[in-house]
């Protein structure tokens, strides 16, 4: 303020550097917790949602914008539109494929959206709906802070732990190069 008001030429605060603090390592979801979440799902939609998030690492916004027509079950891939409307292909595992197919067979609506609400009028699921549902599932099992982005972080961490190059992981996650 003194510098802005021309009472002093240069603030002595400019010589003071911020102290670097350690960034806490962000938590991932354990394999056991993933299995417990799967086992606790009471509807096919939630199971398909968990497996798709876990196996692809897509953002929750990409998940809710997916349409059934963008899923290729033969190739086990789907086209997602990420940040800045960037299109990319992501691949899901066999478990996700089975649970997605079970979920789609159980649906009685004609909505083109991949994930819809459980009750009529079966609207496209919103980001908040996914977040709330995952939080509820986690709380039922006394699992702390279960949210969509944690699945993304878990997928990336597992891929790196298994030896995948970080550049490849960034590409899968849709990070700009």
What does each of the following model-derived ranges do?
Residues 1-177:
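Conserved catalytic core of the tyrosine transesterase superfamily
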């Amino acid at each position: 303020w003194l510098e802005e008001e021309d009472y002093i030429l240069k603030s002595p605060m400019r010589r003071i550097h911020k102290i670097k603090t350690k960034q806490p390592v962000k938590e991932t979801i354990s394999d056991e917790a993933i299995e417990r979440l799967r086992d606790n799902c009471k509807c096919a939609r939630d199971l398909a949602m968990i497996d798709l998030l876990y196996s692809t690492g897509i953002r929750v916004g990409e998940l809710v914008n997916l349409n059934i027509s963008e899923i290729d079950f033969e190739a086990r891939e789907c086209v997602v539109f990420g940040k800045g409307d960037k299109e990319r292909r992501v691949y899901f595992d066999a478990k996700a494929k089975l649970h997605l197919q079970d979920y789609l067979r159980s649906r009685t609506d004609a909505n083109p959206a991949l994930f819809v609400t459980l009750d009529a009028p079966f609207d496209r699921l919103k980001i908040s709906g996914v977040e709330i549902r995952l939080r509820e599932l986690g709380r039922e099992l006394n699992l702390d802070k279960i949210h969509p982005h944690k699945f993304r972080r878990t997928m990336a961490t597992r891929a790196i732990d298994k030896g995948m190059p970080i550049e490849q992981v960034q590409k899968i996650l849709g990070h700009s190069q």
